[in-house]
C-alpha cells in the first residue's frame, strides 16, 4: 500500500468533513466511468503500430510542453530535454535533469498530474522522485514500459478509454483512423478532427504552398476562392466519412466578420503572391471562421474555437524546435463583438454546436457564459491550457454556472499530447465536479439526488451530446 499523498482517496475533495462526505458519495457515480476525450493531440498511428514506448523521457517528458516549459523557465535548454526531436542529451540524462528539478513542479497542475501518473499508472511512489533516485526510477519505468501490458493499446484498455479524438490536417489521408475503425480487436473509437489552421493563417510560413496544394488536390478543378471553399467542403466530408464529428479552429482572435466573394478573392490572390498586409491576413482568417460556421449548417460538424493565444511567442525557439513547444502565450481579447456576425447568423440554430474556449478567466462570466446562456448553438468550453488546473477549474464552475446552469458545458477536454496523463486529467475533473456539487448540496441549494444526476451528465452525457458522439 502506497503512503504517497498522491494515493489519498480524498485528494482534491473539500476540507470540511461533512461536505467531503457528500463529495465522496458523488464521486462514486463517476470515478469508474469510461474516458471520453473529444479533443486532444495524440497520433492515431500510435495505436496502429502499437510499439513499446522507447523510454521514459520520450513518453513522459519530451512531448509534454506543460512539463518542459516549467524546466525551460528555470533555464534548462529545451534541447537537453529532447524537445522537437533534438538530441542534446541522452534520454537518461534528460530524465536526470527532470528529476533534479522536481521541486519546481510543487503547486502546479503539471506536478499533480505527474504524481498521479506515477502513482496510478506505473505504481511508483512519486515522493521518491529526486536527483538521488533518478536512475533507479528511470530503470524501473524502462522495465515497466517493456511489458506488453504497457503498449499503447493495452494502456487504452487500462485507462478505460472509450473515445479519443485526434487533431488532423485537412489533407491527411486518415489511413490510421480507418485501420483502427476496421480493427475488431481494438474497441476504443479514435476519431479525426478537422483542423484547418495551416490554411487560414496567411502569416504562417508555408501558407501559400499548402493552400495552393489544397486547392489543386481537393478543389474539384475550381480556382481561387471558389476552389478554396470547395476544397474545404470536400475535405470536411472526407473527415466525416472517416468518423469525424468536429472541426477545431485555433484562431488568432474572435473576429468573424465575413467578406464579400470579391474581397475574399482579392485577399487570397495577394496572400498567394506574398503581398497581403497584416490587416488583410487577419480579415481573411476572420472570414474563413465565418465560412466554416456556414459549412457547419450543411454538414453538421461541431465547431470549436480556441482563440487568444500568441502562438510561438519565441521566434528563436520556434526556429530551433518547431511548433507546440509550450511557447504559446495568452493575450487579452473580447468575444461579444467578435462573435456577433457568426452567432447572429447561425447561433439560433440548435443543431449547430459552437464551443467557445478561452484562457482568460474573466471572459467566462463577462462574455462566454452570457453568450452560451442565450444562443442555442453556443456552449462553454472547459478550462483550457493555462487554466485547466485545479483552482481555475473550481473557479470556472463559480464563474459560469450561475448564468448557464450545467447544460451548456462542453464536457471535460484534456487537450493533451501526454498519453499517460489522460486518466490523471480526467480523474481531476471528476473530483473537481464532486467538490463543487458537494458544496451546493451542503448549502441546501440542490439535493444530493440531483447532484448525482448532474455529475454523471457532466462527465459522460455532456461530451457525447455536445460533440455529437
Curated annotation (Swiss-Prot):
Is-annotated flag, keyword Metal-binding?
Answer: no
Provide this UniProt record's keywords sorted from A to Z: Isomerase
Pathway it belongs to?
A: Carbohydrate metabolism; pentose and glucuronate interconversion
Can you state which reaction this protein catalyses?
Answer: D-glucuronate = D-fructuronate; aldehydo-D-galacturonate = keto-D-tagaturonate
Tell me which InterPro entries the record gives: Metal_Hydrolase, Uronate_isomerase
Disulfide bonds listed in the record: none
Q: Coiled-coil annotation: which residues?
A: none
Keyword Thylakoid carried by entry: no
Q: Where are the transmembrane segments?
A: none
Provide any one GO MF term from the record.
glucuronate isomerase activity
The EC number of this protein is 5.3.1.12
The organism sits in which domain of life?
Bacteria
Q: Which family does it belong to?
A: Belongs to the metallo-dependent hydrolases superfamily. Uronate isomerase family.
User: What's the protein here called?
Assistant: Uronate isomerase
Query: Where does this protein come from, organism-wise?
Result: Corynebacterium efficiens (strain DSM 44549 / YS-314 / AJ 12310 / JCM 11189 / NBRC 100395)
Could you tell me the gene encoding this protein?
uxaC
Amino acid at each position: 500500500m502506497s503512503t504517497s499523498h498522491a494515493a489519498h482517496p480524498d485528494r482534491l475533495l473539500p476540507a470540511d468533513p461533512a461536505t467531503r462526505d457528500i463529495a465522496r458519495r458523488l464521486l462514486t457515480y463517476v470515478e469508474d466511468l469510461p474516458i471520453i476525450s473529444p479533443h486532444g493531440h495524440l497520433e492515431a498511428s500510435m495505436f496502429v503500430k502499437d510499439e513499446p514506448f522507447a523510454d521514459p523521457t520520450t513518453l513522459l517528458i519530451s512531448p509534454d510542453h506543460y512539463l518542459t516549459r516549467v524546466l525551460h523557465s528555470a533555464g534548462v535548454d529545451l534541447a537537453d530535454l529532447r524537445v522537437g526531436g533534438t538530441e542534446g542529451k541522452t534520454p537518461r540524462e534528460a530524465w536526470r535533469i527532470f528529476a533534479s528539478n522536481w521541486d519546481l513542479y510543487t503547486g502546479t497542475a503539471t506536478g499533480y498530474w505527474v504524481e498521479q501518473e506515477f502513482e496510478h499508472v506505473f505504481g511508483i511512489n512519486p515522493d521518491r522522485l529526486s536527483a538521488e533516485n533518478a536512475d533507479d526510477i528511470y530503470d524501473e519505468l524502462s522495465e515497466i514500459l517493456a511489458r506488453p501490458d504497457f503498449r499503447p493499446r493495452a494502456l487504452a484498455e487500462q485507462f478505460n478509454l472509450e473515445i479519443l479524438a485526434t487533431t488532423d490536417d485537412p489533407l491527411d489521408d486518415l489511413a490510421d483512423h480507418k485501420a483502427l475503425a476496421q480493427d475488431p480487436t481494438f474497441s476504443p473509437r479514435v476519431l479525426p478532427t478537422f483542423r484547418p489552421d495551416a490554411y487560414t493563417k496567411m502569416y504562417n510560413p508555408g501558407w501559400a504552398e499548402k493552400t495552393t496544394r489544397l486547392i489543386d488536390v481537393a478543389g474539384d478543378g475550381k480556382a481561387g476562392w471558389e476552389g478554396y471553399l470547395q476544397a474545404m467542403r470536400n475535405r470536411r466530408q472526407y473527415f466525416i466519412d472517416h468518423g469525424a464529428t468536429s472541426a477545431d479552429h485555433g484562431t488568432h482572435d474572435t473576429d468573424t466578420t465575413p467578406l464579400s466573394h470579391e474581397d475574399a478573392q482579392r485577399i487570397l490572390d495577394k496572400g498567394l503572391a506574398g503581398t497581403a498586409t497584416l490587416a488583410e491576413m487577419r480579415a481573411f482568417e476572420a472570414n474563413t471562421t465565418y465560412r466554416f460556421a456556414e459549412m457547419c449548417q450543411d454538414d453538421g460538424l461541431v465547431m470549436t474555437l480556441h482563440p487568444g493565444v500568441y502562438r510561438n511567442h519565441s521566434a528563436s525557439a520556434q526556429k530551433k524546435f518547431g511548433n507546440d513547444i509550450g511557447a504559446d502565450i495568452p493575450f487579452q481579447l473580447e468575444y461579444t463583438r467578435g462573435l456577433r456576425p457568426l452567432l447572429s447568423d447561425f447561433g439560433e440554430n440548435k443543431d449547430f454546436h459552437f464551443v467557445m474556449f478561452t484562457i482568460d478567466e474573466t471572459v467566462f462570466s463577462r462574455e462566454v457564459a452570457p453568450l452560451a446562456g442565450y444562443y442555442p448553438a453556443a456552449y462553454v468550453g472547459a478550462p483550457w491550457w493555462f487554466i485547466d488546473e485545479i483552482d481555475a477549474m473550481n473557479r470556472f464552475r463559480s464563474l459560469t454556472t450561475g448564468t448557464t446552469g450545467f447544460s451548456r458545458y462542453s464536457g471535460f477536454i484534456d487537450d493533451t499530447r501526454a498519453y499517460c496523463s489522460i486518466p490523471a486529467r480526467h480523474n481531476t475533473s471528476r473530483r473537481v465536479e464532486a467538490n463543487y456539487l458537494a458544496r451546493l448540496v451542503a448549502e441546501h441549494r440542490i439535493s444530493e439526488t440531483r447532484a448525482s444526476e448532474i455529475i454523471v451528465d457532466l462527465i459522460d452525457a455532456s461530451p457525447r451530446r455536445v460533440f455529437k458522439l
